[in-house]
């Protein structure tokens, strides 16, 4: 066999492996769609203490952090919730001056001399755990809601968190994340690539409600403070600390400890291709670092997930090349046969031109065209049951992008409306700060 045949075999092996994944994806989408977003948003005043933790290198330099802080304040005012605190875990001294004046807001400075086995973000997370321990906030009375730099909270987010805590369904929970922020400024390729991530949260519902999870988001994560204090974030040099944290929670507290709160968190996609690939690189390398810390069956699931994730990209590039090469080679033959036999029916022309474009997807078509070319005869093409079966993963793939894109665009409109309110709030708080400073000066 030549190189092209080997490439076909590799691609077909990958394509067939996507069929069970597509069926599982469809099943989870159908099963979880009703609980994906929390719809019971009644305001019942049994307010627990929630600490909204934003872990960042610098809230002053990374301007989107300020947007997230004011989104919390705005949502809390609208639902009349005051039993909360915003904790900015940072390495930048300037953040104290900028945010400490805000009500219910503290700046936790990560000591440069702080020594622990954890690295990067997990080091800051562990420092925050120990800081809460010193302040007596490491009890079941407190809940921690983790956010990223660009995270944005809505009224629905807060009400969903309060409901989950009120109903006592677990000690940790996650919710859906959508990516409408700065969506219009992102590179079109990265914006499209991020469209599949909201759809992936349907799988996260099953991961959290039927643990153990083989992955967990580090943002939109609600966890009881005493549980986080016990587990900690001291996992060594891993780049995917959230994945290990989720498994350790399950290992320590069991299946019923994890749940789904259904509160939507808005975030922004990587704005350029480099950031997009660096993000994916961190996920893959982090999972590879963690894989030996999971039981055998979970190692297999993680390995399959990583392989299919990586091979999906490789297969897509290889498939595109094969489509173009095969189409360019087969199209002249198909047209010549149609011209020689004086075929004028446009449907037949369309049929054979399309079949020239899809031989790598439908091997039976490719064989028919080759035979047709040698016999110089035309007859109906039967694409076969295997080809129809292979269409299913493609349909699910397209559907996942369309649903994710719909969610991103839907919440882009919501964010545009809320950001106007947040700007008004920002200006009002700025005026109060100026008045306060003026009184002190006098």
Q: Which residues make up each language-model segment?
A:
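N-proximal low-complexity "stem/linker" segments adjacent to membrane-targeting elements
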Residues: 1-70
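Juxtamembrane C-terminal module of membrane proteins
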Residues: 18-47, 290, 296-305, 328-442
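Short, acidic, metal-binding catalytic loop of nucleotide-sugar glycosyltransferases
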Residues: 68-83
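Active-site-proximal specificity loops/subdomain of glycosyltransferases
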Residues: 94-141
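Long helical/loop segments within the catalytic core of UDP-sugar-dependent glycosyltransferases
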Residues: 118-132, 160-239, 277-292
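Acidic donor-binding/catalytic loop of UDP-sugar-dependent glycosyltransferases
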Residues: 147-164
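Acidic donor-binding loop at a coil-to-helix junction in glycosyltransferase catalytic cores
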Residues: 239-245
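Catalytic donor-sugar/metal-binding loop of nucleotide-sugar-dependent glycosyltransferases
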Residues: 247-265
């Amino acid at each position: 066999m030549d190189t092209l045949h080997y490439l076909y075999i590799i691609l077909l092996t990958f394509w067939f492996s996507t069929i069970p994944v597509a069926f599982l994806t469809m099943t989870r989408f159908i099963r979880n769609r009703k609980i994906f977003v929390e719809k019971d948003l009644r305001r019942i005043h049994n307010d627990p203490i929630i600490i909204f933790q934003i872990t960042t290198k610098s809230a002053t330099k990374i301007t989107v952090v300020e947007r997230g802080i004011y989104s919390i304040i705005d949502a809390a005012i609208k639902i009349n919730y005051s039993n909360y605190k915003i904790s900015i875990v940072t390495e930048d001294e300037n953040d104290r001056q900028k945010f400490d004046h805000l009500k219910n807001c503290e700046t936790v400075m990560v000591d440069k001399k702080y020594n622990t086995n954890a690295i990067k973000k997990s080091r800051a997370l562990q420092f925050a755990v120990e800081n809460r321990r010193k302040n007596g906030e490491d009890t079941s009375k407190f809940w921690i809601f983790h956010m990223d730099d660009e995270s944005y909270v809505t009224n629905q987010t807060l009400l969903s968190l309060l409901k989950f805590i009120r109903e006592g369904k677990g000690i940790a929970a996650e919710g859906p994340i959508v990516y409408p922020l700065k969506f219009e400024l992102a590179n079109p390729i990265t914006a499209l690539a991020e469209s599949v991530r909201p759809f992936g949260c349907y799988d996260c519902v099953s991961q959290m409600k039927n643990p153990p999870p083989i992955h967990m988001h580090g943002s939109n994560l609600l966890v009881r403070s005493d549980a986080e204090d016990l587990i900690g974030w001291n996992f060594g040099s891993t780049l995917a600390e959230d994945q290990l944290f989720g498994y350790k929670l399950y290992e320590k507290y069991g299946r019923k400890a994890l749940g789904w709160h259904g509160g939507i968190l808005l975030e922004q996609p990587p704005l350029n291709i480099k950031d997009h690939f660096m993000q994916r690189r961190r996920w893959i390398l982090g999972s590879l670092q963690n894989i030996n810390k999971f039981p055998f069956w979970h190692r297999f699931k993680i390995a399959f997930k990583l392989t299919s994730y990586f091979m999906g990209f490789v297969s897509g590039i290889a498939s595109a090349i094969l489509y173009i090469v095969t189409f360019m080679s087969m199209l002249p033959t198909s047209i010549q046969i149609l011209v020689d036999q004086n075929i004028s029916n446009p449907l037949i022309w369309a049929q054979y031109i399309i079949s020239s474009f899809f031989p790598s997807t439908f091997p039976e078509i490719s064989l028919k065209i080759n035979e047709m070319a040698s016999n110089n005869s035309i007859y109906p093409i039967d694409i076969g049951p295997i080809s129809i079966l292979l269409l299913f993963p493609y349909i699910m793939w397209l559907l996942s992008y369309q649903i994710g894109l719909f969610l991103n665009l839907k919440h882009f409109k919501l964010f545009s409306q809320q950001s106007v309110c947040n700007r008004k709030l920002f200006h009002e708080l700025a005026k109060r700060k100026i008045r306060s400073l003026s009184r002190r000066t006098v």
